[in-house]
Regions:
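Nucleotide/pyrophosphate-binding catalytic subdomain
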Residues: 1-180
């Protein structure tokens, strides 16, 4: 299968205006396209900083986390004009942010941040950004990449299992929706 994939980094999804530019770019493309987005600009660093603060027993991690929450809600406010849709997206994003808040609380309570927990925390940036952007672009369908990108552990780190991942990608995107 031939798939057109467009990757937008953090700067491309760092503000209301930049997300609206991504919308224009993607919607102007005639053929089906897969859109991959990073976390909102600066969020990955903020997620890691908050995790570090929680690990070190610094209760100010809660303030950092509340800034992460506010940033996402502000972006949603700016990119989704329809009130009903905006409220629904806010609910979905808040559900993810509540999960993330619980993870931070656990890290704070046990003063420990494993590599797996750190990776999980960072993943929320992309997951939330994807949720927002998929609700901004017309005809977009959200896919959770955790369902088709698989890894295997090798020497204490995870590497992509390309054989399984490629098969799952083909199964997931056949037929390919207009925007995913």
């Amino acid at each position: 299968i031939f798939m057109k994939v467009m990757k937008f980094g953090g700067t491309s999804v760092g503000s209301v205006d930049s997300i609206l530019s991504v919308k224009k770019i993607v919607e102007a493309i005639e053929e089906p396209v897969i859109v991959v987005v990073s976390a909102l600009g600066g969020i990955t660093d903020k997620l890691l900083k908050t995790a570090s603060m929680a690990t070190n027993g610094d209760v100010a991690y809660e303030r950092e986390f509340s800034e992460i929450v506010a940033r996402h809600l502000d972006v949603i406010q700016g990119v989704i004009p329809d009130k009903t849709k905006r409220i629904e997206v806010q609910k979905q994003v808040m559900a993810l942010l509540d999960e993330l808040g619980n993870i931070y609380k656990g890290v704070y309570l046990i003063n420990d941040l494993s590599a797996k927990t750190s990776d999980t925390i960072v993943s929320y940036g992309e997951r939330i950004s994807s949720l927002i952007v998929s609700n901004v672009i017309n005809e977009a369908k959200l896919f959770d990449s955790r369902k088709f990108i698989k890894t295997v552990k090798q020497f204490n780190k995870h590497i992509v299992d390309f054989e399984l991942t490629n098969r799952l990608i083909e199964e997931t995107f056949d037929p390919l929706p207009k925007v995913s």
